[in-house]
Amino acid sequence: MSRSGDRTSTFDPSHSDNLLHGLNLLWRKQLFCDVTLTAQGQQFHCHKAVLASCSQYFRSLFSSHPPLGGGVGGQDGLGAPKDQQQPPQQQPSQQQQPPPQEEPGTPSSSPDDKLLTSPRAINNLVLQGCSSIGLRLVLEYLYTANVTLSLDTVEEVLSVSKILHIPQVTKLCVQFLNDQISVQNYKQVCKIAALHGLEETKKLANKYLVEDVLLLNFEEMRALLDSLPPPVESELALFQMSVLWLEHDRETRMQYAPDLMKRLRFALIPAPELVERVQSVDFMRTDPVCQKLLLDAMNYHLMPFRQHCRQSLASRIRSNKKMLLLVGGLPPGPDRLPSNLVQYYDDEKKTWKILTIMPYNSAHHCVVEVENFLFVLGGEDQWNPNGKHSTNFVSRYDPRFNSWIQLPPMQERRASFYACRLDKHLYVIGGRNETGYLSSVECYNLETNEWRYVSSLPQPLAAHAGAVHNGKIYISGGVHNGEYVPWLYCYDPVMDVWARKQDMNTKRAIHTLAVMNDRLYAIGGNHLKGFSHLDVMLVECYDPKGDQWNILQTPILEGRSGPGCAVLDDSIYLVGGYSWSMGAYKSSTICYCPEKGTWTELEGDVAEPLAGPACVTVILPSCVPYNK
């Protein structure tokens, strides 16, 4: 109590508890909630005032958008009205121009704009990248000041707290991990700490690992360095652990240094750390074998544009598991700005996660995997039915270091084309740009870093599909001068000639062509009936030896135009796309197993519905740096 003249100020220490208790009751009874959060399809009704008071993300989101407004976007690209999602890192909005009229047959994975254009309240938010379990536990904290954590849930809570910028929850998660570390769980804690950059926690967990490692004999240490996945999160940490083992009994163990160092993959260590942390170790400078290993790694880093041609065990990621990646794509919305997200499917968690961000936004582009590098080619950085915003960009992504570099651009701008790798070359075929449909074909030499033209397609094509089989490139369907076609062409790179093959049974474009077990599968897409777009539901299979197409008995689960497509293990995966019959962009993933003749749908949706993305499979590090 304090006095000032005839006035008295009295403090009630129980008020804050009573206020929080009251808010919790309102939340439990779903009273006066004014915003709905959705994570992994599960809805949570909340109060904006509570969210904004605890989360910098929501505070910025709600304050930067008045009660009525257009699309919602945040710095992390998480929040968007459920029925008007916008791509992440959206540029400042400009006055919308009416979309240009699209001629029948124009290759597009998008319908006419009939989406929301009128202002609406921001009261439905899809939190992309947040798990429903993690969000529920974070909301429990916001309304009760208590959070229930376990080693099974702390990673999801930690991820949500960092995405939504709630440092109090992050601090509680870190404290929980630090308190829980034991000899039984230090490996699990170390992995979580590495994923989220928790240096203090990582050091505490590594103490248990080091104590175990120092007691190993030479054979056990050698086996540890060969193990997959590795016991620590980085190659540098593996090197430092090896040095500790050698130094623990230097007189006896130093003879094993060359043998152990051969098992390390020094090219996976960034060049600055090779100089500062590796070269500074005495035996790396004095032992001839170790000197050569270090020199080879430094030479690898000195030639970044040729790294995809210089792959060896020393630069190979320590994993054998390929993962499904989704790159870019066009979300719904009146501004039609493509995504710049690269997402991967976590098969253990059954969810899509954000891996990294492209240097630019792109849709209707191509992605080609070369020695576990991703080459992203062409596409368009803004939707236009006439190819006005097509690009000739070429970028390369390195999952070893989560880094991008720009490569020489294609000689022509292209979107809705096909790209592939054959031996030491990349090929880009057809497509469209501001001049119209393209028949030109370009070839990129992976060793010399140069583009050149090769024999053109017999006809200009866009929105076609392609595949590589037995050293030849097959191109099916597409749009030719506004008409959907069933054509199949085969390119022989040795002879530099194109040959016409048996037509498909169905005209289709914006579809996919995948190779499995010496067969080509044409899946999805659409065609025109009059002026109406119809989903192609039939799945066709082509036998290159017999030059024959057959219609399979199992049609696609639902219409998909412009999905991402990749083959992984024994299945063909289609991600996203547009369904003309449903009038909706898709965020789900369906897969077809030719051996069983069955379709299934994967658990978990991508960050937002997309058409015109690209799919590919790559090997990622065991500790993926997502959501950093």
Swiss-Prot record:
Region feature Disordered, mapped onto this chain: 69-115
Annotated Gene Ontology cellular component terms: actin cytoskeleton; aggresome; cytosol; endoplasmic reticulum; endoplasmic reticulum membrane; neuron projection; neuronal cell body
Alphabetical list of InterPro entries matching this protein: BACK, BTB-kelch_protein, BTB/POZ_dom, Kelch-typ_b-propeller, Kelch_1, KLHL14_BACK, KLHL14_BTB_POZ, SKP1/BTB/POZ_sf
Keywords tagged on the record: Cytoplasm, Endoplasmic reticulum, Kelch repeat, Membrane, Repeat
Location within or outside the cell: Cytoplasm, Cytosol; Endoplasmic reticulum membrane
Assembly with partners or alone: Interacts with TOR1A, preferentially with the ATP-free form.
Name of the featured protein: Kelch-like protein 14
Species in which this protein is naturally found: Homo sapiens
Organism placement in taxonomy: Eukaryota, Metazoa, Chordata, Craniata, Vertebrata
